[in-house]
Structures are given as C-alpha cells and as structure tokens.
C-alpha cells in the first residue's frame, strides 16, 4: 500500500484537531504525558474518539504503514492488525450516531485501514470477510 494512504488517515485526524472539533491537547495527550483530568469530566464523544484514534494508530503500526517499506517492517503483524481493525469497526458502528462531525473522518480512516489490510494480505479475504466487515459490510 502506498504510504500516502496511511498518511491520509492521519490527515483526517489532524483535520479534526485544527478544525476545532477536537481539542489539540486531547489528541496530544495520547503521545505525551497527559494532564490529569477527572474521568467524569471527559465527554463521551472525546473518550470514543480517543479510543478510535488509538485503535487506528495501533492498526497502522501493525500493518507496517509507518515504515518506508511496509512489507519489511519489524512491527508488521497482520493477525494483530485484523483484531485492531475489527475492534475499531465495532466501536465506529456502535457509536456513529454519537460522533457527529467526527463520524465521517473516523469511518474514512477505518475504510483506509481495511483496504490497506486487503492489499497487505498474501491471500486477501473474500469481500465481506475482511477485518471489521461483519460490522461495516464489504469494503471495496
């Protein structure tokens, strides 16, 4: 899969940050030492979105998309990627109505990962049998 496709997932997420729909600090907190906040103070949509971003990032790593050559990435693990993408699909499907303006970019990121998985597989799954497709339907 071309690296630019993986970058597309990140760009969608960055567009959420810079559009003001997600606080930059809330996404930065996943990679830096976060400010301590009471869990009860965090809106549900932020918890769901942060979880989706974490699943997307982990799946991209397991697909080897952070490497110049994904096929040679030491982090590449398609079995783990399948699990992460399926978990992401379940979360996105179950929470789409609550995500508001975040739903579209999160779904786009999910689809990009599903397509990247299909391209990475030596023997691609039949349509509808790929990771998360039991929740999203077949991905083309």
Across the structure, where does each feature detected by a protein language model lie?
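Short, positively charged and aromatic/hydrophobic N-terminal segments
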Residues: 18-21, 26
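Ubiquitous "structural anchor" signal
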Residues: 16-18, 67
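Residue-identity detector for glycine
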Residues: 8-10, 20
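A charge-rich, low-complexity, intrinsically flexible signal that marks solvent-exposed coils, linkers
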Residues: 26-140
């Amino acid at each position: 899969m071309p690296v630019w496709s993986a970058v597309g997932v990140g760009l969608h997420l960055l567009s959420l940050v810079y559009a003001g729909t997600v606080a930059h600090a809330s996404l930065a907190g996943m990679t830096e030492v976060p400010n301590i906040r009471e869990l009860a103070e965090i809106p549900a949509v932020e918890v769901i979105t942060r979880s989706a971003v974490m699943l997307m990032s982990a799946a991209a790593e397991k697909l080897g998309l952070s490497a110049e050559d994904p096929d040679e990435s030491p982090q590449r693990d398609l079995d783990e990627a399948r699990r992460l993408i399926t978990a992401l699909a379940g979360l996105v499907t179950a929470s789409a109505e609550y995500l508001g303006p975040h739903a579209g970019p999160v779904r786009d990121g999910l689809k990009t990962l599903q397509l990247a998985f299909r391209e990475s597989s030596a023997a691609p799954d039949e349509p509808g049998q790929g990771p998360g497709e039991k929740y999203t339907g077949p991905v083309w």
